[in-house]
Amino acid sequence: MELNGAKILYTIHTDIPVLGDFKITQTLVSTWIVMALLSGLAIWLGSNLKLENVSKRQAAAEFIVERLDQFVHDNMGYHFDKYIPLIGSIFALSIGCNLISVIGLWSPTADLNTEAAWAIVVFVLIMYYKIKTNGIFSYLKGLLDPIFIMAPINVLSEVSTPVSMAFRHFGNILSGTVISTLLYWALASLSHVIFGWLPGFLSQIQLFQIGIPAFTGLYFDWFGGCIQAFIFCTLTAIFIKRAAGED
């Protein structure tokens, strides 16, 4: 049994200072595949739209858009409609990256780099709205409240927002992957103990590995993945709204 991170599939050697070599990992390849699948799905759902006699495909597309609009309006208000594509993209990409493991590919969300990249985007937006709302000097002055010696703690509090978002999502997804792997290994050992005494190929029967891992995968990959995507997007909406000074 092995529990390893994403493998490096190919390395492109460069002479760029600081950045170093460009490594193509399982995370990167799986993310590209998910993005390609989501792009194809979006193009398919958004093609040949009609005002009357809409197809089931168009009805499904409209339902998704309406639910996304309602989600953003409920959590952020009507002043943040421009962030509907961002919230929707993060949600779709998160679910896609979680579910890609169902077909045997590496799940990008089991790599902290994926969640960290999303969290950095959210952090930049939070900082933008805080500075836009209060001004750069007022924002910097706020880091000194209530007394100047609290500045390091206030800075740490600002940085902890993207860190906590990234680790929350990553930890839940990775824990599901680890538990599924441990369960699969345990079931294989149990099968060997029970059927190992049989002669020939019968001793190699992995009966307990059939069916049971599918149920655990259904929870961790489908249900758990959707829940974590929902939580991440909800926190994104709330933090951006709060940074903009909206009640």
Positions of PLM-derived features:
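Selective transmembrane helix interface/packing segments
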Residues: 1-247
